[in-house]
Each structure stands twice: as C-alpha cells, then as structure tokens.
Amino acid sequence: MNNLTSTKFIFVTGGVVSSLGKGLAAASIGALLQARGFKICLRKLDPYLNIDPGTMSPIQHGEVFVTDDGAETDLDLGHYERFTGVKTTKNDNITTGKVYHNLLSKERKGDYLGQTVQIIPHVTDLINSFILYNTDALDFVICEIGGTVGDIESQPFLESIRQIGYKLSKNNTVFVHLTLVPYISATMELKTKPTQHSVKELSSVGIQPDIILYRSKIPLSQEQRDKIANLCNVSPTNIIPALDVKNIYELPISYHQYNLDTQILKHFNITSPEPNLDKWENILNISHISTKTITIAIIGKYIKLLDAYKSLIEALEHAAIHNKTKLSIHWIDSRSLNNEITNTFDNVHAILIPGGFGDDGVEGKIIAIKYARINNIPFLGICMGMQLAIIEFVRNVIHLEDANSTEFNFYCKNPVIHQLPELQQNLGGSMKLGSHPCYLKVDSKIFSIYKEQVINERRRHRYTVNLQYKDLLESHGLIFTGHSHHNNNDSLAEVIELKNHPWFIGVQFHPEFKSDPFQSHPLFMSFVQASLNYQETKKA
C-alpha cells in the first residue's frame, strides 16, 4: 500500500436521471488515483433482480461484459478495465438477484438458525460482505451504486453503504454524488433545483454527500455553486463539474483540472505527488491526428441502443486512434438487408458482424457476409459472426443450401453449427464463458497478427462449429487456423480464414473485451489497417 494505514472506500451514487456517467466517473477516479501510485479496484452494485445481465435484452441493458473468470457483468466493468487496466472479476459485480439467491440458499441450509430473515440486517450484511471482500491489500475501493437515488430497488444498497460509512467513519469513506444540472435553452439558464432534490433524497436515507459532481454542458457560476453548497451542506470546492466531452478519454484530465482527485485526497487528509497523466495526454494528442477517415459497416440487430456494442465500438476507436485514422461507423439493421443490395456498401471499407443470439436478422447478416466475400471487402466475424460466415460459405460455395445452425433450425439436414452437449441446460449461466487459451497455426494470417502461437481471449457462446464439416470446408478454401482444447482434449474451432481473400477472419471469441486506449487490440489494429488498404485500392 501507499503508506495508508487502512483501505479507503469511495462510493459513487447518482441522482435525477440514469445514464449520467457514474461508471465513467468511477473509472476516472480510479485512473487518477492510480496515476498517483495508489492500488485500486472498482466494483459495481446493480439493483436489478436478475442474477446477472446474461439473459437481459441488450436493447434494455446494453452489452454484457465478460471477465477473465467468466462472469457476465455490467458494461461499466468494461470502462473500469479500459481506464485502469485492472482486470475485474466475478467478485466486482453484484446484483440484488445474486444477493437474494445467496440469502435464500443460506436460509435453506439453516445458516440463520431459525432467525427471521430480513432486509436489515441479513440482506445488508451480504452486501457489506461483498463490498469489503478481499480489500485489505488495496489503497482505495471505488464502488458504483447502479440506478438512481429514490429507486425502490436501490434502498438496500444505500443502507449498506450508509452502514459502512458509519462503521469506518469519514476518515475512511467518501460519498460522491453525481447529479444533472439541466440547461434550459429558452431562458439560457442552468437549473440547480434537481440537484437540491436529489441530495435531499440521498440525505433522507442517512447519507450526506461529501462531493457533488454535476453533469452539465457548461460550468456553474460561483454564485450557483455557493447556492448548492448552502442548500446541500457541501463545500463549494467540492462541487465539481462533470462536463460533456467529445472523447470519454478526456474525462480523467477534465476531472483532474477541476480538482476531483485533489479533493478526495484532501477529504482523507492524504498527501500525494501530482498524478502522472502523460499516457492520457498522449492518447488525446494522438486522437487529434487523423489524416484519413474510414467507414466500417456493423450489421446487427441491437442498434437501437449502441451501448449493446460498447466494447466493440471502443475497440474500433482504439485501433483507429493508433492508426491515426478517423472512424465512421455505418450501422445497419440486419433485418433491413435482402438480396437486392444496391449501394448499401458503396462507401464502406470493411464489414463487421458482431456477436448475437437468435434467428432474427440472421439472413441479412449472411447476405452481408456474402457481399464481403465476393467483393474482397475486409471482413471480421465475431462469435455468431464467425458461425454465420461458415453457414454462408457452405450454402453458397459448397452448395449445401440447407446448411444452418441448430440454434435457428434444430432439424436442419446440415447442422454446420451445433450446441455443445453439456450446455443443453438452463439458458442463464450455461455458456462457454471467460478467458481460455487458443492455439494458432503458425502459417496463418491470425498468427501474423498476434505474433504468438498461444493467445488468451474471452468467450461467451453456447454453439460451436460442427467439426464433421472441417475437411469439407478446408478443401474449398475456408481454413481453420485457431482452436482450443475442450473436454477430453477435443477441439473447438476458434478462428477461420478465407483463402485468396485480402482479409477475411472469423473468431469464436470476443477480442473487444481486451482492448484499451493505450494498447489497441492487435486484431482490431489489423482490421483497421486492412480497411485503409481497401480504401487505397478503391481509389486506384
């Protein structure tokens, strides 16, 4: 530890409305403290009753972020990893559903010895245990509480952090509250009333915020800050703007400029050298150097909420930044595509099919894959995207037109994609999850990209390639260049490549979960480079 006598806890709550950026605020705090040499971890407490987000609609919840140890978690854990480089685990995300599941399991086993099981103390004790678990070696633990203050679902979590604040005292805890200060364009005014009411709501459960972050387009005046300070019992120096930014990687620098990390350390009476933000300044400088622009088409069915593809978008942005290229994403609803493609892909330099589930929109994705294959457009298929690339190839090159996945047609005659037998149980928590080693063929494009024979990538899938078709596929030019070991040393297909195509790769794993702004993932780097090469070819 950094000469601290005890671990400090930072609790981040939100008010007024959801989606204000609590996760990014928490990640930024972590990055700033880390830049000062402190050892940190970040945790997320989600108030919904699902055990995890694994079976939730991406259009409602956003993406499911998968950790190395196979936990299906909230997308904010992706922000935590990308901002700090600290790998999250199953112990860093808890839900009300998981709390109740553990509680009822303990009750059935008789662990409560005949007690009447109640929210207080039994539910809150479990939440407290989650927050405090394995924290002794850390300088700071940053806990984000999901939802909005005032939500019924959040009450046990707020009570838990209140209890921890009381037990550990203000010397070891700080409460950071993020609110909205809306700008009314008709009167050209910033309105502080929502913040006042949000703090009042938080105070009603016994939590007095120490720092207020206000989300706004422009900073408040000193007079407005004094007003909030007076009505919310918070020092004016601790009322800090969370300003809108063009690039989320500006946030740590922005928060530092407004003294967020300084005020947190002042609260704890901790002295520390100024943070080393060189890598953040460097990434912003690079991001402003874009000599070219490429357009990548992403064909999916969750495009109504782009958070469903959050890590994928960030991974592409990272690769574009390090290729000194501006990225434009052309979002296409897979259900809108049919065989009468006219000029849909005329100005596109690459095509990407991300992961997904179910048969809705599948045929549109297959049409896009065929277009990429025939027209030599760089193509990347991830998870289902790889599986659909195989189906397209078998149908249109090998001419087994009834080829399909048993996910879409259980009784198809040529099931080139099928379900792993041991996973034919419950829908939730029944997939291949987490980081696994993948073995690459040395004489392959994928090896030339990674420059390693054994890689570790995260997976999230229930279906896999039926290897009975492997020889047939390879004899026609679709090559298997990566595999992983399965039960009893059986193999699972992890990577495919198309011969005689400039750049056509499918991967069963999810590389987007391991990209960060400081070290772009090699697969996305190569994909963006291939897009640039294709752009030059089109110009010639």
Curated annotation (Swiss-Prot):
Molecular function per GO: ATP binding; CTP synthase activity; glutaminase activity; identical protein binding; metal ion binding
Function: Catalyzes the ATP-dependent amination of UTP to CTP with either L-glutamine or ammonia as the source of nitrogen. Regulates intracellular CTP levels through interactions with the four ribonucleotide triphosphates.
Gene name tied to this protein: pyrG
GO cellular-component term (any): cytoophidium
GO biological process: 'de novo' CTP biosynthetic process; pyrimidine nucleobase biosynthetic process
Annotated Mg(2+) binding sites: 76, 144
Family matches, as HAMAP family: PyrG (MF_01227)
Alphabetized UniProt keyword annotations: ATP-binding, Glutamine amidotransferase, Ligase, Magnesium, Metal-binding, Nucleotide-binding, Pyrimidine biosynthesis
Record carries keyword ATP-binding: yes
Keyword NAD included in the entry's annotation: no
UniProt source species: Ehrlichia ruminantium (strain Welgevonden)
Pathway terms, separated by semicolons: Pyrimidine metabolism; CTP biosynthesis via de novo pathway; CTP from UDP: step 2/2
Region (Amidoligase domain): 1-270
Active-site residues annotated for this sequence: 383, 510, 512
Domain of life per record: Bacteria
Oligomeric form and interacting partners: Homotetramer.
Name of this chain's protein: CTP synthase
EC number in record: 6.3.4.2
Binding site for CTP: 18, 151-153, 191-196, 227
